[in-house]
Amino acid sequence: MTSVVVVGTQWGDEGKGKITDFLSANAEVIARYQGGDNAGHTIVIDGKKFKLHLIPSGIFFPEKISVIGNGMVVNPKSLVKELSYLHEEGVTTDNLRISDRAHVILPYHIELDRLQEEAKGDNKIGTTIKGIGPAYMDKAARVGIRIADLLDKDIFRERLERNLAEKNRLFEKLYDSKAIVFDDIFEEYYEYGQQIKKYVIDTSVILNDALDNGKRVLFEGAQGVMLDIDQGTYPFVTSSNPVAGGVTIGSGVGPSKIDKVVGVCKAYTSRVGDGPFPTELFDEVGERIREVGHEYGTTTGRPRRVGWFDSVVMRHSRRVSGITNLSLNSIDVLSGLDTVKICVAYDLDGQRIDYYPASLEQLKRCKPIYEELPGWSEDITGVRNLEDLPENARNYVRRVSELVGVRISTFSVGPGREQTNILESVWS
């Protein structure tokens, strides 16, 4: 039995899809365990970009099983669209399995997401307006509709009528907005359910059987640790648990069956939306990193905020996710800079701290304490071994590993599969 969890260690967009795709070559089952279509991942195969939001990266390996776990919230309309996109590109989806326990995102979730965000005014949290939060709210309130319910027409009708009655009271009375008409969505979404029916199964059984039979299982997280609802920069977080612990809840696999946790990070930091970001850059260096790194959201298209590598954030992520290995991406983006910086601690009201505060007010007052390293000018996109990196780039990689306290198993010098280099196999 070997199972590996891939988690983002920053605020998402670290290149998890690329690393999952890379590690999938040696896995037999690939599963997602949380989130929805609010997070996008981009995979480059033979120079062609594929952008996915719901379906695991392993779908590009037809001989492997790809799983949408019970911890996800699934917009059936988005899922059917994504399946059609893959079919048009010649990608088979016969290897997809969808948990019958996953919850369903419906139009009223998206509308409520929009209205709640608008009502916050200047205190917006930067939601993607995909209905993720309201769907998880319904799940916690025990009024959610699951995939299993969607497939049964009578049950779906009864639960949709009940939920719409409640949500429409909110829309009309609280938000002074239009009600959603039952007939406008019932048949449409029931039909989506019928289109995905052949993929639906108890995925916990599949995953546990695979592990019990010695197969390699890869768990793919969405977003990142710093967006975790418990461990992230609350309330500027997502509504689920991207941390490695989320696997056990979101997949139905017990914690004793998790072997390794790979933390994915970039050689710098980025985030989309509002919230604390101690190392954020507002100068020409930040603009250069954004442009060279193509830092625009896969889902929203919004320019990402960028900053220097933050080892305080990384140590927090290592601790709360039990990270055993690190995948360091986008080293090439820093090429051409005379000096590169790493945040090693914060100055909080004149006191040096090496932990990430829970208080937003304290975070606002935190000033990064940097360690400066000499940069490198060489084009490193063709490098295939650590020893072939320029000395300064090599020193940067080693310093990142030292500060985070985790060994680096892969490093990447570009978006392609062939640009990910192995230092140590996580499957051994």
From Swiss-Prot:
Function (record text): Plays an important role in the de novo pathway of purine nucleotide biosynthesis. Catalyzes the first committed step in the biosynthesis of AMP from IMP.
EC number: 6.3.4.4
Positions that bind GTP: 12-18, 40-42, 304, 330-332, 412-414
Name of the protein described by the UniProt record: Adenylosuccinate synthetase
Entry's family note: Belongs to the adenylosuccinate synthetase family.
Gene (UniProt): purA
Listed PROSITE patterns: ADENYLOSUCCIN_SYN_1, ADENYLOSUCCIN_SYN_2
GO function terms (MF aspect): adenylosuccinate synthase activity; GTP binding; magnesium ion binding
Gene Ontology biological process terms in this record: 'de novo' AMP biosynthetic process; IMP metabolic process
Pathway assigned in UniProt: Purine metabolism; AMP biosynthesis via de novo pathway; AMP from IMP: step 1/2
Cofactor(s) named in the record: Mg(2+)
HAMAP family the record matches: Adenylosucc_synth
Organism the protein comes from: Streptococcus pneumoniae serotype 4 (strain ATCC BAA-334 / TIGR4)
Keywords: Cytoplasm, GTP-binding, Ligase, Magnesium, Metal-binding, Nucleotide-binding, Purine biosynthesis
